[in-house]
Amino acid sequence: MAGTAATVFRNVRPYGAERPVDLFAVDGVLAERLPDGAEPVVVEGGGRIALPTLVDAHIHPDKTAWGEPWYSRRPAASLPEYVEGDVDLHHHLATPLAERAHRLLAHAVASGTRAVRAHVDVAPAYGLAGVTGLAEARERLAGALDVQLVAFPQHGVRRTPGAGELLAEAAASGLIDAVGGIDPAGFDGGPDGEGPAQLDLVFGLAERHGLRLDVHLHDVGARGLDPLRDIVARTRAAGLAGRVVVSHAFCVPEISGDRLAALADELAEAGVGLTTVAPSAHQVLPFRELQARGVRVGLGSDGVRDSWSPYGNADMLHRAHLLGWTTDARTDQELADCFALAADGGADLLDLPRVTLRPGSPADFMLVAGECLPQVVVDLPARELVVRGGRVVARDGRHLG
């Protein structure tokens, strides 16, 4: 059929099924069969496992030194010290931000990622260089990777003169998808820990410009829980259900039982989602309990090879593996849950359709060697083929763009 893009992926095993099947991709969507007259491209799967490509719900590609000469990090013990390190690294790196971000995100594609939510620093130290640089990288990767941009006031708005104005400029630029925030009662709070000023600003910008909102919340105890409940109340009042996310939320793993259930019900009713980067056993979100009560939860990479840490690789299958490690996942179902958070959790947060590998699903998947899904989460096999919209976009760990 003229004008129809059709591909047959022969001999693949969706989710590690025992019997191989053929997957038919027609105009970017999986179909039950090919249309009459189609002249498909044929790709041999060789009995490999087909798995949905993944969604990175929280990454900082503007800060990365991925692919750069080794950078020796200085010790840092507080958030202000880490922020100073960001500025130092930004001035230390010769490669333009747009190129570094593209390099990292192309690697993410080759690792099996189909979409990211990218937090980009907006501060007087950089102006809007991060926003424009990531917008350039996003354009270069169009068709292989969806990129949602968050204008993130890493340096704070109360504590950093001019940051609020830059955030407003970013919101009006048409380049971003969401406005960010950071620790409104702690790092960016007033002398007594009050934080309404920042939330007034970011909620106002989100409403005025029709943007989403994604707030970093590292604070624990009341300094974390009180702003979290304030965000829930503001989300309800503004009618922003499904458009607000709180990242990290380290205060949530501190509570359990009835307190956790009550908070989860508040989050679910207001439509406020959460993201975790599985940083440690005591800071990872209790995602199963949250999801069981209707809370949307996503998984992300966070910083990758930046001034904060020499670690990270923008590989969401590896992040699912780390989630399994930090939550002590041992059974097949527990390991599959970790993969599902990387595949479906982020898709739900970013309002993307889930990949089911059934007819009607986006033709977004990767082919890997292995026996079954739980083994893949543990063994981390090479991503031999990555498919986006029915088109091969990466092969053997290399983006083909």
Task: Tell where the protein language model's regions lie, with residue ranges.
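C-terminal cap of metal-dependent C-N hydrolases
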Residues: 359-401
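His/Asp/Glu-enriched, well-ordered alpha-helical/loop segment
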Residues: 233-244, 288-370
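Alpha-helical scaffold segments that flank or form the walls of functional sites
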Residues: 67-119, 125-140, 168-172
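N-terminal metal-binding scaffold of metallo-dependent hydrolase/deaminase domains
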Residues: 1-38, 373
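Active-site gating loops and adjacent loop-to-helix segments of metal-dependent hydrolytic enzymes
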Residues: 64-97, 209, 227-245, 263-266, ...
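Histidine/acidic residue-rich metal-binding segments in metalloenzymes
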Residues: 39, 129-143, 160-245, 249-272, ...
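Divalent metal-coordination and catalytic microenvironments
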Residues: 12, 28, 47, 58, ...
